[in-house]
């Protein structure tokens, strides 16, 4: 986590060029709906949106996904939704579910875990996040439905139900 980006965001300054993002950030900051932090805070929904670069052997590096999962694990509670949006190889959502259950065995079967790939083009991110169809797959049908309910609040495109492994393809 870059502390300078956190500080700038909390002042309402966006560090990247993305049409409409500065205005949106200013608006949500004005209403107290956005707070950047370098550590997770308690929530009902946790979105994992981190880079997944390739290693030297052309294999995806999911270490950022794992690190983010480990960061939020202490904050998860019964009924929470955990969604990975980072581009990830098939099986990543299940691996992170197993990691969460290893770290927090009391939450097995009590939290919702899903995958919803972020597929947007730079320069059109805000529009595409809201307008594009989304594929949403949970580790079970209850997780899929919980994620669908969440995305329905802001996605105008069609929400396609599936399982996590299919969504990761």
Predicted regions and their residues:
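Short, surface-exposed alpha-helical segments at coil->helix boundaries
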Residues: 3, 22, 93-94, 144-148
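Internal alpha-helical scaffold of NAD(P)-dependent oxidoreductase catalytic cores
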Residues: 98-116, 120, 125-169
